């Protein structure tokens, strides 16, 4: 696992996000200090997690594993690298929900007032971006599945 992020890694990440309509638009994918990536023996990216500060904790806002490498525990490896006092993740993916539970995350209903304010601002901006880029397929998918997204949170003692 590495924090090194090449242009090819970014291209791979965007291609993964293109097919995962639950995630933010691939045009918003970027290199970040908070990103973690797993590469195979040939240095090809096979899994990625992005973490964003949400004022009242950190959000796992995308976690992707290449379909050819699923079932190998890569999401567990990524989750073990996510650090912070308060970490949360919204997902409707049952495999990720299972991995989150195994990593000590618990189902919650509310991320906190400051985190909610931050999420309201950022999700509104992402929605506006999807409108501007005419990403109606992603908008439709996310609105249709909105009630199915579940919040998981882990609070680490300091």
PLM-predicted stretches and their roles:
Residues 84-99, 111:
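Conserved GNAT acetyl-CoA-binding A-motif
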Residues 18-67:
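A conserved beta-strand-loop-helix scaffold within acyl/acetyltransferase catalytic domains
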Residues 90, 106-139:
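Conserved catalytic-core motifs of GNAT/GCN5-like acyltransferases
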Residues 1-26, 39, 126, 145-158:
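Short amphipathic alpha-helix that is part of the acyltransferase structural core
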Residues 137-147:
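Extended, charge-rich low-complexity interaction segments
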Residues 56, 70, 96:
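Short phosphate-engaging motifs
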Residues 65, 70-84:
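Conserved acetyl-CoA-binding loop-helix of GNAT-fold acetyltransferases
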Residues 100, 105:
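Conserved active-site tyrosine of GNAT-family acetyltransferases
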């Amino acid at each position: 696992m590495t924090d090194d992020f090449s242009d090819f890694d970014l291209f791979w990440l965007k291609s993964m996000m293109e097919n995962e309509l639950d995630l933010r638009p691939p045009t918003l994918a970027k290199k970040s200090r908070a990103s973690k990536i797993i590469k195979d023996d040939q240095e090809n990216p096979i899994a990625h997690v992005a973490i964003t500060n949400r004022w009242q904790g950190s959000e796992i806002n995308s976690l992707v594993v290449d379909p050819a490498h699923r079932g190998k525990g890569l999401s567990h490896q990524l989750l073990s690298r996510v650090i912070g006092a308060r970490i949360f993740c919204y997902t409707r993916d049952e495999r990720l929900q299972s991995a989150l539970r195994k990593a000590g995350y618990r189902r919650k209903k509310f991320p906190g007032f400051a985190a909610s304010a931050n999420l309201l601002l950022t999700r509104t901006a992402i929605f506006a971006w999807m409108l501007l880029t005419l990403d109606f397929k992603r908008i439709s998918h996310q609105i249709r599945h909105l009630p199915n997204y579940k919040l998981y949170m882990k609070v680490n003692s300091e």
